[in-house]
Amino acid sequence: MSVLSRISLVALCLLLGNPTAYAADNGLEQLPFVKKMQLAKAGDPDAKMAVAQALESGIDTKADPAMAAKWYREAALTGNYEAQYRLAKLVDKGALGLKADKSTAIKLLDSAAKHGHAPSENLLGQMFQNGDGMSVDLKAAVEWYKKAADQKLAVAQNNLGVMLLKGLGTDRNLDEAFKMFDQAAQGEDGWAMNNLGGMYEMGWGTKKDLDKAKLFYQKAADKGIAISTKNLVRLASLSATPAPASTIVAPSKP
């Protein structure tokens, strides 16, 4: 399989690493659990979120999945969009003792996304792209990826780059795809680093530069992206001669 077919295949997979943490800098992390609980019971949405996280992780208190789910729900109901996002993922998987419910998960994501929560926007984009609980709608996927990418969420920038590279839900635009991969790589997204290496190798959206291709493959490999290590080995074995573009045909679906 040639470099960009690998790139596109891998980059189109759902959940390319965990979405960027989106917790508010509200000082709650420095408080003891007892104080967080006091604030949560007094109605503070962010404190409810902090309590839920502590109960889920078992940090600073004994882990209690059922109570964690309760407080995520409480935080979500009081307008904490990070809580809506996390609760959506839990409900989608049926985690923490919650009943799996795709419809409820989508409603929670939609609520958070419509209020500008970038990870929710990105995840909705993935669900539209893959027909996960809804009909496939590539244009909607692009729209949601763009909203999240505009907020500099690296995983969304990478996902949008793949859509632009492949012409999915939008016109194919190698220049814009390169820009998205570049921005996502600056945001430390490992898959984007791999994809940027591929763009430099092929000369897509930029001047061909095998040294930069190797540089970004190495950066991605250092982040644990296995395919990037293979790309480095392949480049060395090809004596710096990339595969012809005509052989690069990526699948239409992840």
Describe each PLM feature range.
Residues 9, 16, 21-56, 254:
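N-terminal leader/linker segments that initiate helical-solenoid repeat arrays
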Residues 27-31, 207-254:
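Terminal, low-structured helical/coil segments at or just beyond the last alpha-helical repeat
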Residues 27-32, 62-71, 98-108, 135-144, ...:
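Structural signature of tandem alpha-helical TPR/SEL1-like repeats
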Residues 37-39, 74-75, 111-112, 147-148, ...:
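Canonical positions in the second alpha-helix
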Residues 41-44, 57-59, 77-80, 94-95, ...:
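Short helix-capping/linker turns of helical repeat alpha-solenoids
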Residues 49-50, 85-86, 119-123, 138, ...:
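Alpha-solenoid helical repeat scaffolds
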Residues 50-57, 86-94, 123-130, 159-166, ...:
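Hydrophobic face of amphipathic alpha-helices that form TPR/SEL1-like repeat modules
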Residues 86-89, 110, 123-126, 130, ...:
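Alpha-helical adaptor scaffolds
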